[in-house]
Amino acid sequence: MVKALDRSLALLKQEKIAVLYGGNSAEREVSLNSGQAIAKGLEDAGFNVVLIDTKVVPLTDLVSNKIDRVFIALHGRGGEDGCLQGALEYLDIPYTGSNVLGSSLSMDKVRSKQIFKACGIPTAPFTVVNKAEFSTLSLENILADLGGRVMVKPANEGSSIGMAQAKTIAQLRNALIEAFGFDTQVLLEAWIDGPEYTVTILGDKALPAIHMETPREFYDYEAKYQSTSTQYHCPCGLNERDENEIKSLSMKAFNATGAQGWGRVDIMRNKTGEWQILEVNTVPGMTETSLVPKAAKVFGLNFSELVTQILQLSVKE
């Protein structure tokens, strides 16, 4: 096995690797930072790397530039939802991470929640609101059915973009209007009052869990990327049994949506001690200070070793 891995690594270092980053999604700025960090990590490991901003360079140029393999660093729409993966399949260029189906199902918060529920994976109660029916709905009944406080989430956005919490009819109406600016379908999820964790998946391994703490109402875009008061704990402070349990649940959720290679699963614990899976991220943030590199470091991998392993996982046997 070791010899096979060494051989695949040697072959990868003969390839021309494109790190695709930037793009047109609402997560463009995060993607630019991820792509630059990944490219540097791969270069430090001895790979032949070229950075390509898909907002500027058309994908068809990958063929003319003789790209052998792609490391996907595009977050959100167009990069994480199966569209890019389908284009790369058509161009016959191998790539990191999940395939078309796994990417699209994981990105879609509504479909992934439906899958979790069908598979018996614990997740908070929810309902779905479509833009076309918004004006005819009883927001009062929806709020009551979900316990009086909800998280409002556009179905296909990441980095907490377009998300808000609501506990009054007016707040819910305003949050839905805001969310419909990003998507025609919105997930309403019962509010979970408890700590949030995240588990990185790398191949068949679940890395050490991270506990995120923020003084804000929830772990929103500002808490993730702008706040200096957000705290990250890894080791996460759970006992061995509880950590093993969230690792197992995270792996089940990852496999349930058809995700592959690597990713990150977000999970919360409610007041009664029950775990609630939030979502699967198939292209999580990858700056030097992002969550996945933090977990990898505790696991014993530096950043270059981490991106090398992700690239190796793209080699199909």
From Swiss-Prot:
**Subcellular compartments:** Cytoplasm
Q: Which residues bind ATP?
A: 143-198
User: Taking every annotated instance into account, which residue ranges of this chain make up the domain ATP-grasp?
Assistant: 113-312
Q: How is the cofactor bound?
A: Binds 2 magnesium or manganese ions per subunit.
**Keywords from the UniProt entry:** ATP-binding, Cell shape, Cell wall biogenesis/degradation, Cytoplasm, Ligase, Magnesium, Manganese, Metal-binding, Nucleotide-binding, Peptidoglycan synthesis
Q: Does Secreted appear among the keywords?
A: no
UniProt-listed HAMAP family: Dala_Dala_lig (MF_00047)
- In its UniProt entry, what is this protein called? D-alanine--D-alanine ligase
NCBIfam families, A to Z: D_ala_D_alaTIGR, PRK01372.1
Alphabetical list of Gene3D superfamilies matching this protein:
3.40.50.20, ATP-grasp fold, A domain, ATP-grasp fold, B domain
Species, as recorded: Colwellia psychrerythraea (strain 34H / ATCC BAA-681) (Vibrio psychroerythus)
Q: Name one GO cellular component term.
A: cytosol
Q: Where does the chain bind Mg(2+) 2?
A: 279, 281
Q: Which Cys pairs does UniProt list as disulfide-bonded?
A: none
Q: What is its EC number?
A: 6.3.2.4
